[in-house]
């Protein structure tokens, strides 16, 4: 077996754990969509792509490690995984898809690697437990509503590499205390930020 097909285990509500064999290179769209009891999944180093909505709605999934072999994560891949507390994003990934982690209300920390150049629309929308995020120097664009509704987010660092921030990227971040940014980048992006929260880098 080299792939897990689209919708393969959709709605298998009693499935608690899954170990994907080393022969698999791709996980299809909606492959484990709404496997409500799924608590753990082991993704082998052979996997290079995770499809759209692959684990969407897996509300019992608590942690996931995405191996370095993965180069693409589909839109909504982990959307509404409301028990997901941590995720390891590999250095091989270049973009975080639209709504990839939307509604992951238990997600507390996320490390975005230096390989990522874009953060998609609604990527972390409604991650209400997320407290801090550091955006690496590789990122050039942050999508619309990317961190909207992250009500526990206290600080964010925006590097000079960012050339565009979408509408409402940080709207509803009611706990936000500081946006760490250079003067130059702020002048370019100030229309999309909170002036009262700005802390300038040297």
Task: List the predicted regions and their residue ranges.
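Structural signature of tandem-repeat unit edges
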Residues: 1-3, 13-26, 36-49, 59-72, ...
């Amino acid at each position: 077996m080299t792939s897990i097909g689209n919708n393969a285990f959709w709605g298998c509500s009693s499935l608690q754990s899954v170990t994907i064999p080393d022969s698999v290179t791709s996980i299809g769209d909606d492959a484990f969509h709404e496997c409500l009891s799924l608590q753990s999944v082991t993704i082998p180093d052979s996997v290079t792509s995770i499809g759209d909505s692959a684990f969407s709605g897996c509300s019992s999934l608590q942690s996931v490690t995405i191996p370095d072999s993965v180069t693409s994560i589909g839109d909504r891949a982990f959307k509404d995984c409301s028990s997901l507390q941590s995720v390891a994003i590999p250095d091989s990934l270049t973009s975080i898809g639209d709504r990839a982690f939307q509604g992951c209300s238990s997600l507390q920390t996320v490390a975005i690697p230096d390989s990522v150049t874009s953060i998609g629309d609604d990527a972390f929308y409604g991650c209400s437990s997320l407290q801090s995020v550091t955006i690496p120097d590789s990122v050039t664009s942050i999508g619309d509503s990317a961190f909207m509704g992250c009500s526990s987010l206290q600080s964010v660092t925006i590097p000079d590499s960012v050339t565009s921030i979408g509408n409402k990227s940080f709207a509803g971040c009611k706990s936000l205390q500081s946006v760490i940014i250079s003067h130059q980048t702020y002048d370019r992006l100030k229309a999309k930020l909170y002036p009262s929260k700005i802390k300038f880098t040297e």
